Amino acid sequence: DFSDSLDDDGVYSYRLTGLARSANAQQKGSEEQRYAIAPAFTWRPDDKTNFTFLSYFQNEPETGYYGWLPKEGTVEPLPNGKRLPTDFNEGAKNNTYSRNEKMVGYSFDHEFNDTFTVRQNLRFAENKTSQNSVYGYGVCSDPANAYSKQCAALAPADKGHYLARKYVVDDEKLQNFSVDTQLQSKFATGDIDHTLLTGVDFMRMRNDINAWFGYDDSVPLLNPDESPNDFGKNH
């Protein structure tokens, strides 16, 4: 993160913020990667006018672990008295969940005199996500998994020992445009000072979603080292 003036008078200045991070998550085989940069440019021709261009770009090739585990084997021990290892990952070995964000806009204000000041803020943002994941959905004996063919194939005595899993294939794009314009008025009536803020704003948002879900193979909690299938085997 660094900033500086581009001229001796301070009329033009900039700021550049960046981030790069890569780490292994707690769950086995899960990674987190994030890269971001946020350039900004400011123009101040005088002490009454300020214009700042803002932008932000972020890419996350891997967002980390996506899933959840039941109380069996975590909060409560399994029937064999053991618990799942803390790095247990019930997902497929090739789960993917990526995200990409970008934003551009500006902030402008100008003071006409001691009474009137105008401000305007404009933003355009876009967020894209892509996910192909298998995740836990409670033990097979849970009534919520009554429609799972994989759980139904198990013997009743085994259903409490197997983790039901679902899969999700999801591609989303969210776009947002907003602009607001404000007029600030300062005046007095007798001994009372007033500040009146008036304005108008506009926002448009669109979200495109292409997704589907379903049940995947269940996992035996008594043998958590059994490798889950690759994503795509059953989809």
Question: Model-derived features: where do they sit?
Answer:
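Outer-membrane beta-barrel transmembrane domain signature of Gram-negative proteins
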Residues: D1, D191-L196, V200-H235
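Acidic/polar loop-and-plug regions of large Gram-negative outer-membrane beta-barrel proteins
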Residues: R21-A25, A38-R44, K48-E111, T115, ...
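P-loop NTPase catalytic cores that bind/hydrolyze ATP
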Residues: F116-N121, E126, V179
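Transmembrane beta-strands of outer-membrane beta-barrel proteins
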Residues: Y12-L16, F51-F53, V118-L122, H194-V200
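Short loop/turn motifs that connect adjacent beta-strands in outer-membrane beta-barrel proteins
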Residues: D7-Y12, D47-K48, N113-T115, A188-L196
